[in-house]
Amino acid sequence: MVEQRRLASTEWVDIVNEDNEVIAQSSREQMRAQRLRHRATYIVVHDGMGKILVQRRTETKDFLPGMLDATAGGVVQADEQLLESARREAEEELGIAGVPFAEHGLFYFEDQHCRVWGALFSCVSHGPFALQEDEVSEVCWLTPEEITARCDEFTPDSLKALALWMTRNAKNEAALQEKPEETE
């Protein structure tokens, strides 16, 4: 009976190959222990005026406890769609619900801690925020420059996600400015 309860509470994740194709499923615990390649969502929460919502991870997190995160998000569960995962994570971690999410594509990140295919999203929110106590200890607003100045305090994967979001946003803004206006 105890074993059944343990299995029922196990979080299962898709394991993917270098092409982001599902090749297996494993427990989250096994994925972390063996540094298996998986999927995660990264959500840049911003105020629409240049500030990014930054989270401090709790000391009990299984991945980089106590560090700052430039994005909300987390591991995609087995068989879960990416946007569904992003919405779930934003609501669980911060209480963000009912706001539009912009999709910014996929990226790959690998370091000594993880191997992950990231799905990048963003949303505008001004709070109030309801923090998930076992994952997020506090939040604050920082500019990208302030984040860069404190980069050693941040999870490396969230910094990559933020940098990609900034680059992709700059390209979108440039394309909009170059687009000739229609005349009647």
Curated annotation (Swiss-Prot):
The Swiss-Prot or TrEMBL record annotates one GO molecular function as: metal ion binding
- Report the cofactors: Mg(2+)
User: Which SUPFAM superfamilies is this protein grouped with?
Assistant: Nudix
Q: Which amino acid positions bind Mg(2+), per UniProt?
A: 89, 93
Q: Which UniProt keywords apply?
A: Hydrolase, Magnesium, Metal-binding
Please give the CDD domains that the UniProt record associates with this protein: NUDIX_Hydrolase (cd04697)
- Where do we find the motif Nudix box here? 73-95
Look up the EC number in the record and give it: 3.6.-.-
Q: Which PROSITE patterns match?
A: NUDIX (PS51462)
Residues in Nudix hydrolase domain copies = 36-164
What InterPro entries does the record point to?
Answer: NUDIX_hydrolase-like_dom_sf, NUDIX_hydrolase_dom, NUDIX_hydrolase_YfcD_pred
UniProt lists the family membership as follows: Belongs to the Nudix hydrolase family.
| Name listed for the protein in its UniProt record | Uncharacterized Nudix hydrolase YfcD
The scientific name of the source species is Salmonella typhimurium (strain LT2 / SGSC1412 / ATCC 700720)
